[in-house]
């Protein structure tokens, strides 16, 4: 195995308790494999904890990672450092302090970021665990719906995040009319409350719909983390067959390069390394990430001037001139060799 990846905010990870997680940590340490964790909460308040008040849920989730890794040399990858909702931005300082403390106490802790202030999630991300576990009949009971309504409204106020910030990316065949619109916009068009429309969308997607939402971060936080020595770069994106795409698929990495060339990001060598060699090292990928004899020739050629002066967020990439996968040219300027693209990639052995 390459390691273990946990999504503690989602099923089935959200049901894992501390003792079970400690066993996973022990296993990773035994075989010197990384544990990549999407924490239980990445916002000031969330549906992962019962109490809406007191310590930030984001920081409680960090406390859990501290607890399960205490006294170990675990290779812990926090994926990813985001702060969902405007009221969560203030947790950034303590988040960094916790990461530093982990390292000071022997845990090989790192985190990663993407160069976007929004992100993609499943439509159920704002539904509490107890509601998701109910039968359809139980969900229809007025008392349960009232409890849910009060909880979501309170969370929205405390978080600085609401249905106006949740854009539908995909519900399913026949529901294309919803794509690209916020839950609030769809509710208004259908003469329903935001909550009723949201629950209907959950049902129509069989609770598997996809959403784009934010804010997850700020340009200032991203700029700061670009200089943090324990931060790697990633996209958190993949091309979907249907619906609205995650904007990060187009220009997330070019934007990191653009920041570097404009002097707001890390140095260019460090920026490239965070995307390549440092990531290969972190996940122990053999013969990847470096330009060395005997290594696989995975190259991206970019135009510095074009990258530096481009306008980002235009649903297209910029600055990338050539891409080689395993030594074969798959992108030459704007011409994509689809045949080569299908055959040049390979599963990585670890």
Model-derived segments and their meaning:
Residues 1-71:
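Hydrophobic, small-residue-rich alpha-helical packing segments that form membrane-like cores
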Residues 1-14, 51, 66-70, 74-264:
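Active-site neighborhoods of metal-dependent hydrolases
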Residues 7, 36-40, 79-81, 111-114, ...:
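Generic beta-strand/beta-sheet core signal
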Residues 10, 41-43, 82-84, 278-279:
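Acidic, glycine-rich active-site loops and adjacent beta-strand->loop/helix elements
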Residues 137-139, 223-230, 235-236, 247, ...:
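C-terminal cap of metal-dependent C-N hydrolases
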Residues 195, 270, 274-278, 298, ...:
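Mid-to-C-terminal alpha-helical segments outside catalytic/metal-binding sites
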Residues 209-222, 267-272, 280-316:
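Acidic, glycine-enriched loop/beta-strand segments at the rims
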Residues 253, 258-281:
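Gly/His-enriched, cation/cofactor- and phosphate-binding structural elements
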